[in-house]
Design a protein with these regions (language model features):
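Hydrophobic ligand-binding cavity/cleft-lining segments
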Residues: 2-59
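Hydrophobic/aromatic beta-strand elements that line small-molecule binding cavities or substrate pockets
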Residues: 30, 64-67, 89-95, 106, ...
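A short, structured loop/turn motif at beta-sheet edges
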Residues: 36-37, 68-70, 94-100, 119-128
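Hydrophobic pocket/interface hotspot
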Residues: 39, 49, 75-77, 93, ...
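Short coil-to-beta-strand transition motifs
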Residues: 84-89, 111-113
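Beta-strand/loop substructures that line and gate deep hydrophobic ligand-binding cavities in soluble
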Residues: 103-156
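Generic C-terminal helix-cap and adjacent flexible tail
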Residues: 163-169
Length: 169
């Protein structure tokens, strides 16, 4: 059942791995060159999040990034691509444990959206970030993988996070 992909490491970058752990679960991980406190801030402060979340190769503009990072708090990200209509992604934070763990719902697909869990484990001044995406069905994960909105995109996204964190130390 396991499907693994990995980006190749370069001198300044770490490897991003993606693994399908079950029919509904995708896990993406990467060691980021910075302490957990700073990496966590990059995930929870809109002014930092906007700098790395959207893969540059997509040509998307992040028009707005509203984040109320607390249990029960909501988030909403609005993207635009060229002349197309803006698209929104939104949900609710269900768990916030600085600087170790974030859990949120993805509600733009209705009640049966995916749930994202991100853990941050610091070791030696670097932080292992593990993002787990639990989809409502095998078909939903299959569709996400087919649209390349998961593992491939996360390689570039995590590279951008790594590059930003190095500047924040």
């Amino acid at each position: 059942m396991e499907t693994r992909t990995a980006s190749e490491p370069t001198p300044m970058k770490n490897r991003t791995t993606s693994e399908r752990k079950s029919p509904r679960e995708l896990v993406v991980s990467r060691t980021i060159n910075g302490p957990a406190r700073i990496v966590f801030e990059a995930w929870t402060k809109p002014e930092l999040f906007k700098q790395w979340w959207v893969p540059k190769s997509f040509g998307l503009t992040l028009l707005s990034c509203d984040m109320d990072v607390r249990p029960g708090g909501k988030y909403k990200l609005v993207f635009k691509h060229g002349a197309s209509e803006p698209m929104a992604f939104y949900g609710r934070y269900t768990e916030v444990t600085p600087p170790a763990r974030l859990v949120w719902t993805n509600e733009e697909g209705g009640e049966d959206g995916s749930v994202t869990t991100v853990t941050f484990k610091e070791e030696g001044g670097k932080t292992l970030v593990v993002l787990t995406e639990l989809y409502p069905s095998k078909e939903a994960l299959d569709a996400a993988i087919a649209s390349s909105s998961t593992s491939g995109d996360m390689n570039e996204t995590f590279e951008q996070l790594d590059a930003l964190v190095v500047t924040l130390k």
